[in-house]
């Protein structure tokens, strides 16, 4: 009985090991243009007025990402993205829209747990392009640099890649802040890309 269990366990481990690989050989380089939607949200500490609600700001995410396949289960990716971030804040009869547009540089490790599927995490460096509160310029009030931790999952099929990730902002957006007001610009993004082998 013990032998049967051991053989079964070895078979499961072997199958899992074979499944835990990328779709490409070690040492391969790929380039992936991508486009999709971003859903910006205000996180951190924010003094809420009575009846106030934080809302999502929807925008565009587009860019390009290169990936190096280091092992059968690990890819290292670096990219450059344009992202429309920010948020909406609603109180009765009034909506304020914070429009923050960034160039983001993500550095991500892709862990290929099964063929085609990758879990990912890393770091992201954001550089502010424009900032508006409704239609008023707000750039002088905003930090020029944003640091975030992206976490996500992707699936590749016939070179097409669907990527969903959440960028947890670490650094605050507002220059003038205190213990009760430390605004952070989170971003959930869903993109479709196509991988070219170099």
Predicted regions mapped to residue ranges:
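Residues that define the transmembrane beta-barrel architecture of outer-membrane proteins
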Residues: 27-31, 52-60, 99-103, 143-149, ...
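Predominantly the C-terminal beta-signal and adjacent terminal strand-loop region
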Residues: 138-198
């Amino acid at each position: 009985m013990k032998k049967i269990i051991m053989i079964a366990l070895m078979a499961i481990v072997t199958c899992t090991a074979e499944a835990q690989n990328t779709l490409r050989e070690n040492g391969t380089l790929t380039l992936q243009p991508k486009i999709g939607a971003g859903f910006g949200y205000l996180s951190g500490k924010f003094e809420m007025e009575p009846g106030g609600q934080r809302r999502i700001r929807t925008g565009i995410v587009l860019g390009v990402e290169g990936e190096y396949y280091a092992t059968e289960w690990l890819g290292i990716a670096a990219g450059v993205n344009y992202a429309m971030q920010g948020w909406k804040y609603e109180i009765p009869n009034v909506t304020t829209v914070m429009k923050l547009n960034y160039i983001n540089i993500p550095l991500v490790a892709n862990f290929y747990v099964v063929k085609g599927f990758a879990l990912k995490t890393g770091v992201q460096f954001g550089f502010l392009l424009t900032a508006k509160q409704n239609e008023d310029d707000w750039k002088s009030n905003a930090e020029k640099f944003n640091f975030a931790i992206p976490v996500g999952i992707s699936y590749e099929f016939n070179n097409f890649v669907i990527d969903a990730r959440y960028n947890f902002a670490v650094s605050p957006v507002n220059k003038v802040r205190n213990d009760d007001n430390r605004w952070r610009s989170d971003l959930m993004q869903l993109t479709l890309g196509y991988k070219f082998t170099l």
